[in-house]
Amino acid sequence: MMRAETVLVIPFADGIGDFINAQPLIAALKRRFPEADFTVAASEHGNLLVNDPTVAVLKPSGFNYEPGRMAIALRPLLPQRLMAWFAGPTFDRELGPFDMVINLFYAWEKGMDFRTYWTPQVPPVPGAVHSLDFLADEIEKQLDITITHEQRKPRLIVRPSASLYASRFWLDNDLEEQKVVALVPSTNMAIKRWTLDAWLKLDAHLREMGHRTLLFCDRQSSSVQRAFEAAGSTAIPVYTSLDNVAAVMSRCDLAVGVDTGLLHMAGALDVPWVGLFGPTNPEVTGPYDQGKGISLVAPFEKQTTCGGCWKHFKYEDDSCRTLQDSSCMSHLAEAEVLAACVDVLKRERTTPPLYLPTYGYPEPVGAY
């Protein structure tokens, strides 16, 4: 039987949602190598999201690198698969050495059919496979193990200190006995954003229905927060460390968000959700358990110029080649999103958040 005392796991990407989705895979690997010490190559957010405090999260120095103009210009010429392969020996040398390196980044780039399935088509193209399923299947084949469907579902554990923060937040803002909706408009990719006007309308309609809204912000006094305030919204801004964000999110009755890390967080906390998609396919990169929410894909029939969208914004830049001043997200109607919110809010939440006693967690640093 294959043995290893030290294992490095390289997630398939370095976003918040990517780390959340990698956790069930890491758990499966730990079951296969129960005596091994595990390290994950990820940015600081990993320390605030990792469920297992025995797993070390280390940030490679390359993650601090901001590419210059020349690097950005050359990037389309460098095969992403090659860059993913080099991550293995590079991170092993910097962070290790390790007995075993499990490079999910390379497996993902090598095997996923991004050209066909990354950007959702209208009508949908059958045959899409979720990234988590693809990687779990690869691990099963390589290590001769079984990862059941239930074991593949991402779970996020709320830490005790964060739970206390959320309890105080609820009391301070008089949210007890209220229906609370989390709004997640922020993403670092402009092409995935829904229009600000649509967000303001959705917020107003939800509040008119008697719900309280929380505006999850990626920075203090963000432009979105200022726009909400200028519109007279009473949405409560949320900006805190990621473990606290998870605790606040876990108490919400619904999360509405674009394809970003906090949407995956909601799914991993069993918070009912409505996901807004345009250039990315919910069947490939959306929350894993689709039974917990509704994925809405912008009803924009893709043009020939959309054929390379997966490559343009995933590897090159952040612009739509088809719509000059926006993206297909602008075709997603607020009325459709509101109707989905009403539908999901009618459902009873079936699973409470997971909590663990305090032990061995790093101090909270950084924020969403």
What kind of feature is each model-predicted range?
Residues 1-368:
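Catalytic machinery of carbohydrate-active enzymes
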